[in-house]
């Protein structure tokens, strides 16, 4: 039997973490998360963090020398060229971590949580693409509440990714998170039990 590698993606604040947590807790699937790998990439003393400080100055660092994420976010979500520069450093690191995780896993089903799965051409790492969607107004509201952002800041982050409609068009499975949690989890169960 070939290994199923689910690429779990969706827009920012659509419910990817909810789905991933459910797949881990209810179905006991191994979850590998791009956001965790990306945080590792810029950890204290890493060459990528040094490059970021070299480009933006020491003001991009907190007093303990770690990355000031909100400050970096202000830069990269307002300037596409800066975002692309940062992604060119972080994404190869993240891809390598995924390749290592896949190679080392013996599980018949793996879940790779990759918010920018489609945008950064990592679809070749997975055997199926699951996209979590919700309404645009829900996405905006959730993001503003979760990250304590203004409307403009939240919209800039949403605009930095492909639209939910574009992602859904490429998906093997679309999980609609615009109603209840129960409905979302039922969709996950159905998708998991259906071999593509």
Curated annotation (Swiss-Prot):
GO cellular component terms, A-Z: cytoplasm
Name its pathway. Cofactor biosynthesis; coenzyme A biosynthesis; CoA from (R)-pantothenate: step 5/5
Main EC class of this protein? Answer: transferase
Q: What is its EC number?
A: 2.7.1.24
One GO BP: coenzyme A biosynthetic process
**Catalytic activity, reaction form:** 3'-dephospho-CoA + ATP = ADP + CoA + H(+)
Q: Which UniProt keywords apply?
A: ATP-binding, Coenzyme A biosynthesis, Cytoplasm, Kinase, Nucleotide-binding, Transferase
Identify the CDD domains for this entry.
DPCK
Which GO terms of the molecular function aspect are on file?
Answer: ATP binding; dephospho-CoA kinase activity
Where would you find this protein in the cell?
Cytoplasm
- Leader sequence range is none
Q: What is its main location?
A: cytoplasm
Superkingdom of origin: Bacteria
Q: What are the DPCK domain coordinates in residue numbering?
A: 5-196
Family, per the entry?
Belongs to the CoaE family.
Give the protein's function.
Catalyzes the phosphorylation of the 3'-hydroxyl group of dephosphocoenzyme A to form coenzyme A.
Protein's name according to its UniProt entry: Dephospho-CoA kinase
Task: Name the source organism.
Answer: Trichormus variabilis (strain ATCC 29413 / PCC 7937)
């Amino acid at each position: 039997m070939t290994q199923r590698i689910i690429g779990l993606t969706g827009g920012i604040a659509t419910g990817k973490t909810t789905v991933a947590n459910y797949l881990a807790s209810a179905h006991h699937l191994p979850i590998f998360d791009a956001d965790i790998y990306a945080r590792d990439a810029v950890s204290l003393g890493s060459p990528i963090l040094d490059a970021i400080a070299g480009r933006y100055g020491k003001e991009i660092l907190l007093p303990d020398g770690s990355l000031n994420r909100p400050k970096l976010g202000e830069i990269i979500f307002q300037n596409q060229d800066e975002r692309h520069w940062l992604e060119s450093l972080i994404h190869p690191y993240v891809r390598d971590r995924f390749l290592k995780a896949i190679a080392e896993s013996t599980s018949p089903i793996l879940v790779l949580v990759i918010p920018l799965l489609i945008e950064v051409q990592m679809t070749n790492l997975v055997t199926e693409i699951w996209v979590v969607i919700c309404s645009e107004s829900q996405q905006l509201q959730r993001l503003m509440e979760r990250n304590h952002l203004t409307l403009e800041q939240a919209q800039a982050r949403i605009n930095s990714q492909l639209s939910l409609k574009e992602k859904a068009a490429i998906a093997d499975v679309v999980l609609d998170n615009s109603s209840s949690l129960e409905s979302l989890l039922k969709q996950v169960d159905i998708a998991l039990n259906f071999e593509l």
